[in-house]
């Protein structure tokens, strides 16, 4: 049996983070949740993940800074931003940092699931 893909979610809204974590677990992923960018970076350093899903607007360390730190540790890890920041400049910045995708809240959970599967097929 194939090993479950490990996903790190970094999201400061505890309700949203919990719902997203449960949804992905329901689809057979091994999911960790961090409540801010600092906690997310610590979890990333301790565990080998297959995908990171990052909010942008968070206390202590925003998602763009976190993504830059993650990229300095692992250039290949797939990153998806999942955020309410919808300005063109934010989307462009996300991709310049190295995002594989950028989804704007509110979003369709099935689309996130399909984007994740697509990333896993390529990697």
Predicted feature residues:
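Conserved acidic carboxylate
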Residues: 11
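Two-component/phosphorelay signaling modules centered on CheY-like receiver
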Residues: 14-32
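Acidic catalytic/metal-coordinating carboxylates
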Residues: 36-39, 62-65
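Active-site beta3 strand of CheY-like receiver
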Residues: 47-53
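Active-site residues of response regulator receiver
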Residues: 55, 83
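The feature encodes the CheY-like receiver
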Residues: 59, 87, 105
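C-terminal output helix
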Residues: 107-116
